[in-house]
From Swiss-Prot:
[4Fe-4S] cluster 1 binds at C10, C13, C16, C55. This is Ferredoxin-like protein in nif region. The gene is fdxN. GO terms for biological process: nitrogen fixation. [4Fe-4S] cluster 2 binds at C20, C39, C42, C51. SUPFAM superfamilies: 4Fe-4S ferredoxins (SSF54862). InterPro entries: 4Fe4S_Fe-S-bd (IPR017896), 4Fe4S_Fe_S_CS (IPR017900). It comes from Rhizobium leguminosarum bv. trifolii. Its cofactor is [4Fe-4S] cluster. The keyword Iron applies.
Amino acid sequence: MAFKIIASQCTQCGACEFECPSGAISFKTDRFVVDPKICTECRIEFDAPKCRAICPMPNTCVPA
């Protein structure tokens, strides 16, 4: 499984893109998106998903 970003809640601060260790988050057209083929949910590198931890808005970066 991968994560997704709820666009209607996203402030577009870009913190998640910068923090993502796998480079799965990018800005496309008018929103940040997570590429499910690249997203590792930070399982190997960290105890929790970095996008979820860094996001200033609760429940914006969620399991897909």
